Structures are given as C-alpha cells and as structure tokens.
Amino acid sequence: VPAPAELPALADEEIIERISAVHGIGRWTVEMLLMFQLGRRDVLPVDDFGVCNGFRLAYGLRGMPRPKALAKYAERWAPERTLAAWYLWRAVDLHRAGKLPARRGKPPRVAQLKKKTKSAPQAQRR
C-alpha cells in the first residue's frame, strides 16, 4: 500500500491496483478516494449504480449500460470523466425531482451499452 505522500505522484490505475489489493477495499472505494480526496479529474466509476442510472436517464436508454461498454463510450469525455460522473449523478437527482428534460429524437448509438436481459419463454409471454 502506498504511503499518503506517494499518492500524488502515482497514476490512477496504479493507485487502484495497489490499494484494492488490501482485503475489503475494492475498485469503487479507491475511485471515490481518487475523486473526492485526491481531486483526480479523469475518473469515471463505471460500476457505480448512480453513474450507470444517470447515463441511462440522460441518454434515454431502457436498460442499464454494461460497465465495459460505458467505459468505452466515456473515452470521449477524457480527461474530464470525474466531471461527467458528477453530471450523471445529478441527472438522477433531476429525474427524481421531475426536472430532467425529456430527450427528443433518437438516442445516440449506445444500444450496445444495454445489459442483456433474459427474455421470457414464448409460452409465458401471453
């Protein structure tokens, strides 16, 4: 585990790898440390429910995005993915308050981001 004084000099992924090696500390926890304690600007916690839900709401998707596909889509937001996370969390807040504007037109090509859901057998669909 790196000493606190070492952290500013380390890359985000190196910090994630080294700290999440500690039993009980996962990637999400380290990403929150990077964002809120170290002020890193290019972190998008794609496993965060709020980030995924905000993306679903903002882009008018029916299903939740898969984390890997969301990470790929979010490459265009670098080097400001932390800011994107904040806006995605805010989209959830606005939706709950009834203030998220409805999307007009087709959503961008993000269909591949939806999680696959098991469809019911034909006999049960009636």
Regions found by a protein language model. Name each.
Residues 1-126:
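Catalytic cores of DNA base-excision repair glycosylases
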